[in-house]
């Protein structure tokens, strides 16, 4: 689905990708991060995104926001705070790559949108 769309010159947006596997299945579950990364890269045939947007928020703040939704948490969302801290730490390690845009998720929606739009505009010009 992704490769044909890219070949046709289309923009492809995805909510999560292999970086999520590295952060959650690797670091957060305390598995071998390098091994999870290699398997994940194999699964996506080494197709890396041009841009990965990381909405950064502390684990405590994320859990607090999640609990305010009134929706029952899924299996992953029921994990303890240290699980999410490990995932966040891994995301921040991954985010040293230039394809990442780290956005402070404490900002207003308008501020977040402005940062994302500016970075996306650089890519599609």
Features from the language model and the residues they span:
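Conserved beta-strand edge residues that scaffold enzyme active sites
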Residues: 19-20, 109
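NTP-dependent small-molecule kinase module
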Residues: 60-125
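Loop/turn-to-beta-strand initiation segments
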Residues: 8-11
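Hydrophobic/aromatic beta-strand patches that form the interior of the parallel beta-sheet core
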Residues: 13, 51-53, 101-103
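Walker B catalytic acidic pair
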Residues: 16
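N-terminal phosphate/diphosphate-binding loop that engages ATP/GTP or pyrophosphate donors
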Residues: 1-5
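A glycine- and Lys/Arg-enriched "phosphate-lid" helix/loop adjacent to the NTP-binding pocket
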Residues: 20-89
């Amino acid at each position: 689905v992704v490769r044909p769309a890219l070949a046709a010159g289309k923009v492809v947006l995805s909510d999560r990708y292999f970086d999520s596997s590295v952060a959650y299945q690797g670091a957060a579950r305390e598995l071998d991060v390098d091994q999870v990364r290699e398997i994940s890269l194999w699964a996506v045939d080494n197709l890396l995104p041009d841009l990965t947007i990381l909405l950064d928020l502390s684990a405590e703040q994320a859990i607090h926001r999640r609990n305010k939704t009134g929706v029952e948490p899924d299996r992953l969302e029921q994990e303890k705070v240290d699980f999410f801290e490990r995932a966040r730490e891994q995301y921040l390690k991954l985010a040293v790559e230039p394809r990442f845009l780290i956005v402070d998720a404490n900002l207003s929606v308008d501020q977040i949108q402005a940062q994302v739009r500016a970075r996306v505009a650089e890519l599609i010009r």
